[in-house]
Structure formats: C-alpha cells, structure tokens
Amino acid sequence: MSNDYSKLLGKITEKFGTQAKFANALGISERSVSLKLNNKISWKDSEIAKAIEVLEIDPENIPAYFFKYKVQQE
C-alpha cells in the first residue's frame, strides 16, 4: 500500500514554490524528494520532522500529510 502525498505536495508548492527549494531547506537532493513523494523510497523520521518544521504543519495534521494511504479505484 502506498501513501498519498498530494496534500504534502500542495503544502510544498504553497510554502516553497518548487520541490528544489523544499529539498534545499531539508538538506537533501531534489531527486530524493521526488522519489519520496512518488513512494519509491521512504521518508526518514528526521526528514519528516524537518519537513514539519519548515512547512509549519500543525502536529494534529501530520497524519494527513505523511500517513494517508492511496485509495484504489475499482
């Protein structure tokens, strides 16, 4: 099962404009961000913590950004 990062991507665009600027704020490569958003590699706990900080995500909303599963359409 894969995660739905559409809300996270919207927040990245709102705060940073591009994935590259967001990646720079996290201290990782743009490719790493892309792979994470496309469920190719997992987020490390430290990266999630940093993303929450730089995106100013309210702690109660964290699950909606990082732990929402994609729903399969039948």
Which residues are covered by each model-predicted region?
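Short, Lys/Arg-enriched anionic-surface-contact patches
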Residues: 1-3, 30
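DNA major-groove recognition helix of helix-turn-helix/homeodomain DNA-binding modules
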Residues: 46-62
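Short, charged recognition helix plus adjacent turn
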Residues: 2, 10, 15-16, 35, ...
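Key DNA-contact positions within bacterial/archaeal DNA-binding proteins
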Residues: 31, 42, 60
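Short, solvent-exposed alpha-helical "recognition" segments
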Residues: 40-46
